[in-house]
From Swiss-Prot:
The lineage of its organism: Eukaryota, Metazoa, Ecdysozoa, Nematoda, Chromadorea. This is Uncharacterized protein C01C10.2. It comes from the Eukaryota.
Length: 204
């Protein structure tokens, strides 16, 4: 992963998130219809590899993030992936990230979950990702925030590049020559995507 803008080499994973970092439906639709599923699969694998390097010391976060990337891959990169489902899922992720402080506050006092007033966007978005708000699903979502945040940040960045290429009136290089690639380790993604996270292995 040589693209230092998308995957900066830093000591601590940067999860700073701008509330303005929303996925553009129009641009995402262009990219989703123009770029094949292999491109999206490579993107998911690349972001997953980057995030895991920073969270691998915490098993709960590690396996939770793996589960998040499995679901993202199902929505974006498989043969039956559909634009509407993919966009709905990424939009839900965005709203959950934006409301992370609410989730953290709720999990700090689980008895308040049923009485806490939450925004319609968070309620709907959480339901799309994990179903009902419970202590277990909230804790899982918080553990998955590194995966969700980095994925949205990278996609928003790539959308801007997509738009910049259009303004230059040059051919889009995304299809054949992306500026990022999965790192030097070979990810056995067939096993990863099956949900068997405990059996993920890497080959040098």
């Amino acid at each position: 992963m040589d693209d230092k803008e998308l995957f900066p080499k830093v000591d601590i994973l940067n999860l700073t998130f701008s509330p303005k970092s929303e996925i553009s439906e129009d641009v995402f639709k262009q990219m989703f219809s123009s770029l094949d599923r292999l491109w999206w699969s490579r993107l998911v694998i690349s972001i997953r590899g980057y995030v895991i390097n920073y969270v691998q010391q915490n098993d709960e976060v590690l396996f939770s993030c793996d589960d998040a990337f499995i679901k993202i891959h199902q929505k974006l990169a498989e043969r039956n992936s559909q634009f509407e489902d993919a966009f709905e899922y990424l939009t839900a992720i965005f709203h959950v990230i934006r409301e992370k402080n609410t989730l953290i506050q709720m999990i700090s006092n689980p008895k308040s979950i049923s009485t806490t007033k939450i925004s319609p966007n968070l309620d709907r978005s959480f339901n799309i990702i994990h179903g009902n708000l419970t202590p277990k699903t909230i804790q899982l979502t918080i553990a998955q925030l590194p995966a969700y945040t980095m994925f949205i940040k990278v996609v928003v960045n790539l959308q801007q590049r997509w738009e910049n290429e259009k303004l230059k009136k040059k051919s889009i290089r995304f299809e054949t020559d992306p500026e990022w690639e999965p790192d030097e380790r070979v990810v056995l993604f067939q096993t990863f995507a099956s949900g068997m996270t405990s059996r993920i292995r890497y080959d040098k």
